[in-house]
């Protein structure tokens, strides 16, 4: 054999021997990248490292794909730390085993002198560890850092129990805590959960509970020899729950609340001889509860829980403790703390709430306290309404011995008083078992306060909700469907809808002056009609502000019944009896306090005067000048008689006073009628007050200039009428020009005539001393002679004119003809379609397709709402007044209107059923 062949054979044999002698992971001469080179290599102390990307906390080899790595085991007497290697791919792991042991699933045999230090990093990927449990006497130090900067550590120390520093152990065993994945919620933005391994007697493998993504679960293990445990808080944005170990022999347990963006609570259990593990209820928003645990014999665990979606508060503010006693005598101690010094109590709803203590077997016992909510509440861990996740606590001493027994247990002490150095304010809340609305709050070290909640009838609450919905819906003038009304009634009371609707109709009729009328019995559509009729001058008849005007009439009536004056406290007491509260912002009335003391006073409906001889200062309300101009005492007296179900003559003195006022008004009206028709409404300026500096003399202004200034003045009055505020003379001159001072009476006369004939309003002097003016609507016909879609803006009211035009044209008019009519009234081209569409949706108009029309055309006719709210005679009178004619000038329409009035009078004698009016 040649020398070359011998050398090549030797090289091949050497490589084969090297492959047989070495492991499968690396070549013979190249060590692994994660294998320590010598004893001083810092990688020995690094422990198990996580890869940069999303990886798994397993024990694989550095090659790709699933693989297994079995590091060498320690022999007897060796003192070598173990190292676990993690690769980048999805791998599986096997725990290190001893070559002399029974199998790969058992912990390695470690002799005396073996010190093991391990740290496990939790990555973002899924983990599948099978941690063994440590036997009795084993000692281990465990550190669990979390990737992305979030670290969680558990340091275990106890006087008589095992020390967690790496020391010499008496028996073989390694305790590896469970790893954490995304599902368990250990991340910067997820749910932060503490989980710890079970320390039991003897070697074995303990598998932790699987944690899903939805429920937040914490599993506290127990130790038979007792542990003193201190857990630092975690930091995250979500729900943070920390569960403590339970011990037997007086452990000193402290758990600070986690610092997350949520509400945190910790509760101390009542002191006793029994073993219990407490789970505190989740506190609602704005409350931070922290109570130090008491120290007596028995197992005591303080478990802080947190609720998310609320800023975290600290315990630096004012704190108090609440000792809640249930019907069975169970009591607890809470200390709510607010960051800004506010003190809050646990929210208690309507109904009874029970508190139960669930006792487990010999190992541990768990008690759960439920949060008081509306209706009967069962015991269990409560959750916040906005967070669907459930907090589940489970405490088990040994997996083989799981015995659960549930019993209702009462605490021995009535309350648990916190330490005085914490500056807690102690209270006791006593709830009457017979009357759930009666609550007594007694301070343990302060004065006693007794509170009795006002009983609320669920039926009345549903009536109030339906009433507000009807009033809001009526402002849009749209028909109200029964299905929409049922949505505002609680599901448990929808079967009593007829009774609730009847009560709401009574309130509408008595207080808000509306009648609930069924428009269509088949489709169950309702509308609101004016029932009590408008006031004489119609100033208070403002449909969009109808509820406010009804409230004003009630106040005016109360002032009238109390001798034309009433104190503010008496008015609030009267309103409270009708369900109107000062502090509550109603959706219909808005801010009631501002409405009374600001808006009605500014609008001169009320006068608000202080009483000088009262300390503190009190105020009295009187009728304002606008109220005296727009209504009468007789009208208000009849209104109050309907509310109190009486007759106006039941108040004889007030009735005689109202009759005298009506007689005076008749004399004044007759005196005005006797005057010339073209009489100036306002006096002319005296000649001696004329100034020669004007460009034109008072009687030498051109007619066009006077008409221009009068139109501008009309625009000002219409603009200010929506605010109901008085218009001073100075403001008028500032708007139209100060050069109009000399011709001011003439301009007022022109503007008053335009407002009276065109817009149906009258210009009056509200305050002669301050020269302030205002508008009010005077309807010369019957009470509801005209209907208006926008009463507060007369310039936008074209409903009565459109209805009259349709009636004059033969009860139907083409769409193009109606638009041409609106264009003649000054309506812009872009708005005519909007106006007619609104009238169609409000059922004032109906559209009928013209047969054989190409392109398609429609005719407008009166709708059902128009036939209910007005009549043909009223429309004919309206047209006659506009054209300065008499209704008889249209003989055909007048005869039809008279027949319609006869039919209405006959229908008024029998019950009216509105059905298919189209």
Curated annotation (Swiss-Prot):
Residues 70-96, 113-126, 213-227 have a biased composition (Polar residues). Residues 704-918 are annotated as: Interaction with DTNA. Keywords: Cell membrane, Cytoplasm, Membrane, Nucleus, Repeat, Tumor antigen, Ubl conjugation pathway. Expressed in cell bodies and dendrites of hippocampal and Purkinje neurons. Also expressed in peripheral nerve, where it localizes to the perineurium and myelin (at protein level). Predominantly expressed in brain and at low levels in the heart, liver, kidney, spleen, testis, lung, thymus, placenta and skeletal muscle. It comes from the Eukaryota. The keyword Oxidoreductase does not apply. One of its GO terms (cellular component) is plasma membrane. Residues 1-140, 154-227, 367-388 are annotated as: Disordered. Gene3D superfamilies: MAGE homology domain, winged helix WH1 motif, MAGE homology domain, winged helix WH2 motif. Residues 459-658, 706-897 form the MAGE domain. PROSITE patterns: MAGE (PS50838). It is found in: Cytoplasm, Perinuclear region; Nucleus; Cell membrane. Residues 8-23 have a biased composition (Basic residues). Coiled coil: none annotated. May enhance ubiquitin ligase activity of RING-type zinc finger-containing E3 ubiquitin-protein ligases. Proposed to act through recruitment and/or stabilization of the Ubl-conjugating enzyme (E2) at the E3:substrate complex. Interacts with DTNA. Interacts with TRIM28. PANTHER family: MELANOMA-ASSOCIATED ANTIGEN E1 (PTHR11736:SF9), MELANOMA-ASSOCIATED ANTIGEN MAGE ANTIGEN (PTHR11736). This is Melanoma-associated antigen E1.
């Amino acid at each position: 054999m040649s020398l070359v062949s011998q050398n090549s054979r030797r090289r091949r044999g050497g490589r084969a021997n090297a492959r047989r002698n070495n492991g499968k992971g690396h070549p013979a001469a190249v060590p692994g990248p994660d294998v320590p080179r010598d004893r001083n290599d810092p990688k020995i102390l690094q422990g198990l490292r996580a890869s940069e990307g999303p990886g798994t906390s397993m024990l694989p080899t550095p090659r790709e794909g699933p693989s297994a790595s079995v590091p060498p085991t320690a022999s007897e007497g060796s003192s070598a730390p173990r190292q676990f290697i993690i690769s980048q791919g999805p791998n599986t792991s096997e725990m290190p085993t001893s070559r002399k042991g029974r199998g790969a699933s058992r912990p390695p045999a470690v002799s005396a002198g073996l010190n093991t230090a391990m740290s496990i990093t939790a990555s973002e990927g899924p983990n599948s560890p099978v941690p063994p449990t440590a036997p009795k006497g084993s000692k281990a130090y465990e550190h669990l850092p979390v990737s992305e900067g979030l670290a969680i550590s558990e340091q275990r120390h106890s006087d008589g129990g095992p020390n967690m520093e790496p020391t010499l152990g008496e028996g073989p065993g390694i305790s590896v805590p469970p790893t954490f994945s995304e599902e368990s919620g250990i991340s910067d933005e997820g749910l932060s959960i503490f989980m710890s391994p079970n320390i039991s007697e003897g070697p074995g493998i303990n598998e932790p509970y699987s944690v899903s993504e939805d429920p937040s679960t914490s599993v506290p293990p127990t130790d038979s020899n007792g542990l003193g445990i201190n857990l630092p808080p975690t930091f995250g944005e979500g729900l943070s729950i920390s569960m403590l170990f339970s011990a037997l022999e007086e452990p000193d347990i402290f758990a600070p609340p986690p610092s997350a963006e949520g509400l945190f609570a910790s509760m101390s259990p009542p002191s006793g001889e029994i073993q219990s593990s407490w789970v505190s209820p989740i506190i609602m928003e704005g409350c931070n509860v922290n109570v130090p645990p008491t120290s007596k014999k028995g197992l005591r665990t303080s478990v802080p829980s947190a609720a998310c979606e609320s800023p975290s508060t600290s315990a630096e503010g004012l704190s108090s403790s609440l000792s809640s006693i249930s019907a069975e005598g169970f009591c607890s101690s809470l200390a709510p703390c607010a960051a800004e010094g506010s003190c809050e109590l646990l929210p208690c709803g309507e109904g009874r709430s029970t508190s139960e203590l669930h006792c487990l077997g010999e190992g541990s016992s768990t008690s759960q306290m439920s949060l008081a909510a509306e209706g009967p509440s069962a015991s269990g861990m409560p959750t916040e309404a906005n967070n669907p996740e459930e907090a589940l606590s489970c405490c088990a001493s040994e997996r083989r011995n799981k015995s659960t027994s549930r019993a209702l247990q009462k605490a021995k002490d009535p309350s648990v008083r916190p330490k005085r150095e914490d500056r807690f304010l102690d209270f006791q809340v006593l709830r009457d078992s017979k009357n759930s609305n009666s609550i007594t709050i007694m301070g343990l070290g302060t004065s006693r306060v007794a509170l009795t909640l006002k009983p609320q009838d669920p039926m009345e609450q549903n009536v109030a909700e339906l009433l507000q919905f009807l009033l809001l819906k009526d402002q849009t003038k749209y028909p109200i469907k029964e299905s929409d009304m049922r949505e505002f009634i609680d599901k448990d009371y929808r079967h009593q809808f007829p009774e609730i609707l009847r009560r709401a109709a009574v309130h509408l009729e008595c207080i808000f002056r509306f009648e609930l009328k069924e428009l269509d019995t088949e489709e169950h559509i309702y509308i609101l009609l004016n029932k009590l009729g408008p006031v004489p001058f119609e100033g208070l008849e403002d449909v969009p502000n109808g509820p406010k005007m009804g409230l004003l009439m009630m106040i005016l009536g109360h002032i009238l019944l109390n001798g034309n004056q009433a104190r503010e406290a008496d008015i609030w007491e009267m309103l409270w009896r009708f369900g109107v509260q000062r502090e509550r912002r109603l959706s219909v009335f808005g801010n009631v306090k501002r409405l009374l003391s600001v808006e009605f006073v500014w609008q001169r409906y009320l006068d608000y005067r202080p009483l000088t001889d009262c300390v503190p200062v009190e105020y009295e309300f009187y009728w304002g000048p606008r109220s005296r101009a727009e209504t009468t005492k007789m009208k208000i007296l009849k209104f109050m008689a309907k509310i109190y179900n009486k007759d106006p003559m039941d108040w004889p003195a007030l009735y005689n006073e109202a009759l005298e006022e009506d007689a005076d008004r008749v004399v004044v009206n007759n005196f005005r009628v006797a005057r010339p028709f073209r009489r100036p409404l306002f006096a002319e300026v005296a000649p001696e007050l004329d100034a020669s500096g004007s460009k034109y003399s008072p009687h030498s202004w051109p007619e066009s200039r006077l008409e221009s200034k009068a139109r501008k003045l009309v625009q000002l009055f219409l603009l200010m009428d929506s605010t109901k505020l008085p218009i001073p003379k100075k403001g008028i001159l500032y708007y139209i020009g100060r050069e109009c001072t000399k011709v001011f009476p003439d301009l007022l006369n022109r503007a008053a005539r335009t407002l009276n004939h065109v817009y149906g309003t009258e210009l009056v002097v509200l305050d002669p001393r301050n020269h302030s003016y205002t508008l009010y609507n005077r309807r010369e016909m019957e009470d509801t002679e005209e209907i208006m879609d926008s009463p507060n803006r007369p310039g936008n009211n074209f409903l009565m004119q459109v209805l009259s035009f349709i009636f004059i044209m033969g009860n139907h008019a083409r769409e193009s003809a109606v638009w041409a009519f609106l264009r003649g009234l000054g309506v812009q081209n872009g708005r005519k379609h909007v106006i007619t569409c609104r009238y169609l949706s409000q059922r004032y108009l109906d559209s009928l397709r013209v047969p054989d029309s190409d392109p398609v055309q429609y005719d407008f006719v009166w709708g059902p709402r128009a036939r209910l709210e007005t009549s043909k005679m009223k429309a004919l009178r309206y047209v006659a007044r506009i054209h300065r004619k008499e209704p008889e000038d249209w003989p055909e329409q007048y005869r039809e209107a008279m027949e319609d009035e006869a039919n209405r009078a006959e229908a008024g004698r029998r019950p009216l059923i509105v059905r298919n009016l189209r």
